[in-house]
Amino acid sequence: MKQYAIQPATLEFNAEGTPVSRDFDDVYFSNDNGLEETRYVFLGGNRLAERFPVHSHPLFIVAESGFGTGLNFLTLWQAFDSFRSAHPQATLQRLHFISFEKFPLTRDDLALAHQHWPELAPWAEQLQAQWPLPLPGCHRLLLDRGRVTLDLWFGDINELTDQLDATLNQTVDAWFLDGFAPAKNPDMWTPNLFNAMARLARPGATLATFTSAGFVRRGLQEAGFTMQKRKGFGRKREMLCGVMEQHRMPTLSAPWFYRSGSEKRETAIIGGGIASALLSLALLRRGWQVTLYCADDQPAQGASGNRQGALYPLLSKHDAAINRFFPTAFTFARRLYDALPVSFDHDWCGVTQLGWDEKSQQKITQMLSLALPAGLASALNAEEAEQAVGVTTRCGGITYPAGSWLCPEQLTRAVIALATEQGLQTRFRHTLTSLVAQESRWQLRFTSGETASHETVVLANGHQINRFDQTQPLPVYAVGGQVSHIPTTPALSALRQVLCYDGYLTPQNPHNQQHCIGASYHRGDESTVWREEDQRQNRQRLLDCFPDAKWATEVDVSGNSARCGVRCATRDHLPMVGNVPDYHATLTHYADLADNKTSAAPAPVYPGLFVLGALGSRGLCSAPLCAEILAAQMSNEPIPLDASTLAALNPNRLWVRKLLKGKAVK
């Protein structure tokens, strides 16, 4: 299994209080005045003060080659806030900053470095509060209520730029070419990086860098930038600035997974669960007009209606895509839920998954071999597990200290209420029966006979996403399940964390003195009828896993209190996020894909029709990032996921994988 460790930066502070990298023997910023140097080199070198007021798009995108202490980002954020205060009516409303860092600082070192610039404290404190764990890949931080987005890519920039999705091509407005000096870190300053910068730069994009090294100037020129020298900051004689004046048409490396968005920011979302709610917020933040159609009388009547749900990442012993996606999705979910200005029952108590038999112990051993950061997942022996969860288990496992339980029903309703305050239009008791494309719009028809017309449509209606002609071929299936509600007892009330075994048991909700235990699993079953056998099995699985635990015998399901729901799942346990693929066109266009990959056209899709679904049993974990991914795609904005993992979420993936191998799609 692939190791997921990212090495943190090792640094010390010199006599001037400047952080110095031990790995590269170089300062993170100038001893003289790092803040002023950033303003001169990167903000001034890219002419941002004069460009912001005349920018013709609501979003300005900056990319950077080395995040370091975040000085460049914080300085830019401060300047952007000043611009917004001075020009509240300007077209430019939001800032998106993309940065790469191979050796991220620890949160403590970051805070120490930030003490150097007291005037940046209001922005630095927000960055520190959301500072991510050292996981490889992209970490999206939503700051200042979403007006500022920071994408932190942890890993080697020369490797990461090769892994970026094609939708990021020609989107960057300005480049900050920063990092340790070329003489100290020659591995970063490569033609591969310069070519990637050119590929990502939109026509007219600028760049600035502190160095004036000849090989850097020549490399950027060869990549396509028009370069010039400028007076350097302070004692430095020269620096470099550049402009992308060429207009290139980059090739698509995997056109069968290409994603397209929409220039028309108006949509209908079909659904009423957590995915619909979070997508509404993400689109509203980007200036969309959003109408939500829900078949029920109120939100959260489907799979999102449970009283308690566990929040922790899915890990796999064999699927690299799962192991890339879910840890990132989990950390994003925690940041988002923490920041939401709404109330819902929850407890960030942690989740512990136990190895109660040989098979489950082997699975946990394989999960631990991923070498995930301790802040995300770590091993527990039997004694440590009992101390963590508060009850006798007599077995060890893996613990997720940032895991939790929360009330999906309350969360969903609160988010939809928040979105309504921000402009969301809601239509309840609207059951969609069909979608018809009419003159670049979609006509929606409901059981009541009512119709509506929208520019774009998102299907986020759980296990019913494949009820329409366009989506019927999607390889998804329904999973019925029953969660039992049980009263607490003195012994059960000792449970401090969510306990996962061949089922799960939550700590009591102090607002109702009840636990949730579950859940039964019925593939292909859409029934929501209460079942006595499911109630009994929910209890029996706990007793089977912990036969010697007296506290487990106190689980009482005789009150017959439970909730039945239906989830939507896929064979590979990953969500479906993106354009709705045209099944018949896909099979026709890609009939000889295995032998003609180089000439393949972009994936056939239904224009303006999207899907967000198949979240399975980990919707609380995956829904926030999936909603953010789809909102970014629909808005033609940077997507916070590498191309390979993003392909693993594409609704057409199961068909395309077979076609790439020359196999028949059934």
Swiss-Prot record:
Signal peptide as annotated in the record: none
SUPFAM superfamilies per record: FAD/NAD(P)-binding domain
Positions of region (FAD-dependent cmnm(5)s(2)U34 oxidoreductase): 270-666
Compartment(s) of residence: Cytoplasm
TM region positions: none
Known catalytic reactions: 5-aminomethyl-2-thiouridine(34) in tRNA + S-adenosyl-L-methionine = 5-methylaminomethyl-2-thiouridine(34) in tRNA + S-adenosyl-L-homocysteine + H(+)
Cofactors required: FAD
Single GO molecular function: tRNA (5-methylaminomethyl-2-thiouridylate)(34)-methyltransferase activity
InterPro entries, A to Z: FAD-dep_OxRdtase, FAD/NAD-bd_sf, MnmC-like_methylTransf, SAM-dependent_MTases_sf, tRNA_MAMT_biosynth_bifunc_MnmC, tRNA_MNMC2, tRNA_S-uridine_synth_MnmC_C
EC nos: 2.1.1.61, 1.5.-.-
Function according to Swiss-Prot or TrEMBL: Catalyzes the last two steps in the biosynthesis of 5-methylaminomethyl-2-thiouridine (mnm(5)s(2)U) at the wobble position (U34) in tRNA. Catalyzes the FAD-dependent demodification of cmnm(5)s(2)U34 to nm(5)s(2)U34, followed by the transfer of a methyl group from S-adenosyl-L-methionine to nm(5)s(2)U34, to form mnm(5)s(2)U34.
Name of the featured protein: tRNA 5-methylaminomethyl-2-thiouridine biosynthesis bifunctional protein MnmC
